[in-house]
Amino acid sequence: MPKTDACERMLQSIRSHKNSKLENQRLPAILLHSIDNYIDSKSLQRTASVYFSALLALIKQSNGFDYSSIYILSIVMPATPSDEKLLHIDLLYTQIVPYLQKNNDDAPTIRCALNCTQEFLLSFSNESKELYLKAVDVVMPLLVKFSVDLRPKVRKISIQVLQTLKQKYDGLLPHLYPAIFDELQRSLSEVSNMDNPSFSKGLHTLHLLECLVDINQASGSDLGIICNALSRILTSNIPTSEPIFEMSIKLILKVLSERIDALSDAVIYELCDSLIPYWYRALSVTLLLYDNFVNRNPSRGIKGIQTLLEKILDFCISPLQSSESDVEYDGATSSDILNSLKFLRNKFTMKFVNKKNWATVLSNGIKKVIKTITASSRHANYAKALPRCSVYLQLLLGAIPEDQISELLPAFSVVARAIIKNKLVETPECLDLFKIFIQKLASPTFLECLGFADNFCNIQKSHWLPEVFRDNITGETPETFFDCFLPTIEAGNSQWWELLPLYTKAGCITNNLNENTLKKLASAIYNDRSCHSHVAQAFVDLTKIENVRQLISSNSSNLIGVLGNTLATMKNDDSNAEDLVMAATSIFSVAGDQQLQIITNLCESAPLSEPSLGSTGVIKLFPALLSISPADTWKPFLPHLVKLFDIAIPSNLSQSLSVLNFGPGLAYRLLQATLSNERMISAIVPVISRLYDSMNSVGDGSQALPKYVALERLKTWKLLFKLLPNDEFHLLPSAIAEVVLFSKHHDDDLRAMAFELLVEVGNRMKNGGKINMSLIDGEEPNKTVVEANINEYISMISANLMNDSLNLKVSTIFALTRIFYEFSDYIDDDYVNAVLEEVQSSLQSNNQEIARAAVGFIKMYITSFTKSKVLFHLDTLLPLILRWIKEHNAYVKLKAKQLLDRMLRVFSLKELEAFAENETDKEWLQRIWRVRRSRGDKKVVDNKRDASDSEDLAIKNPMNKKAKVGKVDFRKHEKKLNKASMHRDKFSTGMHTSKRVQKKN
């Protein structure tokens, strides 16, 4: 919104409060009315500049301002030109600044004064840099002071002013940062030195620091000031649970994480010395400082780290050295220290410590851990110390170099076995310890530390182990799994199969995988249902490993045989069937010369003509293999595929739905797999006409097929349409007739698929091709070859209007509606006129279903074609529609009204009245026109469609499932509609009831 419009809107709002009971609303309104009267008496325009001048005169006359004057001034200043504001700069220095310096009580007036200050500063920044910097030096301390004010609204407006100025002018930082740092030091010093401090102001100061100071732009000296100020909070007696303490930790960690190298040595030394006595309050900060300190002063840094790690270890084992359940540190709880240790796991790197110094740092600590844990196994607080020691080892593991990890293994082994013995594995700290170590160690070494290497009974009892291994195994070969876990699996513990994909998914080269191992995997699939998904995924992964493919290829026939036999014992809807099919497909893809033998074995072991095969999971295997098979392998299968449609179902199985419909269902899926295989296309094209004939021969009654079979059939037609050569379009009419029937199907998905196919075929025809008319059934044998185009496509579809089938006629009108809408720019006028004449005759039909479909076509025609084309047929269309209003039931009347409403969007009332046959028709037109006018819709829309009718929308956009043909069952509402019609006829205009009926619809 422009500033002038916003100003006028706000002033109008103020004027409306003249009689308000609230003083802060009434007084500004009275003042504004007085100014308005003065401006009007002087015959001036009510502009922001005029109000600005009047208010300045009033303030000077009163030798100061009150809330009313400064409030209105803050509203008009944004719309006042900058040059006018610069002429009155004295207002800032003589009135506003002194007021802000002396008065702290009246918050509303302060907020308005701050807004005026912002407007002056913005004007200065645009016009005069010198004036701007002078003003900034004066007002910056005030803005910072009010930015930490205890009143939220004052604080908010002050921060907004500072943020706005910072964005507008980059040169503000040298003036802004010193003011913020002064306030930071002052407020934090007060907080840390007071006996009973109020933390609010200090917290607001930290918030100001976070909002306005960019750590990456601050200088090293500025960062030093920030760290020193924040360290006062960390070393004070403020409880660690206070928000000001937590925010101080957050800010100083941000500085150390992003800009620690910018801090001077003196600052680092000072911070380390001040924080080491309070390490338990700010452990993360202290450790990060010493981590960097090593690089600046190795001897002092190593000594400090060693001291700090000793203190941390003493904390971890303190429960074992005291009878108390927990040891409290001054102001810091054990959970605070543990959380700090967890935070440091990946940030404490010790990258500047060499190997010799590492040995010094680690040796005493590791020995102390081993000794204490071993000697205190019966202590009452033993379970309390183990999670702490786990976090301590995690800290060291995150910092230690890779080649030094072996130094930690003795301590890890002692702690890990103690954790397992005391059943503490599922505590978060202990579980994290295992997960972090498995990422660093090989599986055999890890299991050896846990004591599982030679004792598989322990592995069997460790139900938590899969969670430790899951998502933490990297770069290990499958042999590791077979060596570590296969023995316990063979002992009857099949749950360990879930770890197998963790070792195979990495794709590492393996040299020791042998045929015997593959047999064990295949045997597991056949005998153990619980391992299906895991072993199947392993086979998929193994086929991707280069040096394993040959081994799998040589055993592919046996492996796929086992998978096929297993699938034959599974139900078709079994959740594991897809996994086994995926494994078989992967193995088949690397089978090479054995593919033909594999297919032969499968066909012999599971005859495709066997109806009972439909209830097993093996039916999913054939399409999957067919989709990736070479053409030569499956050429002999194509004739059998065509015969597959003629399967006879035994009478004793006819009651089973899945068996009854299995034959065509599988045939369609197999045919789809064939048609989608690019290597099979050369084998398919020569028999494409045979496939069309086969599809048509089993197409009778396709409307009655179960949904899943009908969908598979339409998907097959889609692929056949795509592969049809451009010179064989004579095969289309019979197929199109079936698809047209589906365009009226009661199921939304089938109807949407049918419309999609009709449009795709239309695009093929639009791009050209040949139609041999003599080869089309029912055509004369001596007809010529014609060029394919949209007009010929319209002829193919509209030919179905001559059929005696009521269902086909209605479906054809629906299909034509969609095609005309989609290709309106490509259809010749002669074809449009011919189809429209047929549809007009349908409008006169006494069959409501046919007439309803015709209404949908007319609605599309009116809104999708040009006005001139619609006008050509208006003399016949309008009387038919008006006849509908007078002769049909409430639902049909409603549709007819909608048609007339659409016409009134395209034509004027006079244009339509010219085609009315009598005065009654004119009255109906005038009535509908008045309804439109009462709704306030006076626009004439040319060539736009209306998305209000769900049935029409489904024809135009069938993929929109929110509005589809048949979605609303008007039969359920027929009584209501008839009742509404009766009430409507009682009124001469029909306006009120018409609106109500339309709203219900």
Swiss-Prot record:
Query: Single Gene Ontology BP term?
Result: maturation of SSU-rRNA
Tell me where in this chain the PTM Phosphoserine is found: 948, 950
Show the InterPro entries listed in the entry.
ARM-like, ARM-type_fold, RRP12
**UniProtKB keywords:** Phosphoprotein
GO CC terms of this entry: nucleus
Q: Where is the composition biased (Basic and acidic residues)?
A: 939-948
Q: Does the keyword tRNA-binding apply?
A: no
**Region labeled Disordered — which residues?**
939-1001
The coiled-coil regions, if any, are: none
Q: Which PANTHER family match?
A: ARM REPEAT SUPERFAMILY PROTEIN (PTHR48287:SF1)
Question: What is this protein's record name?
Answer: Uncharacterized protein C1105.01
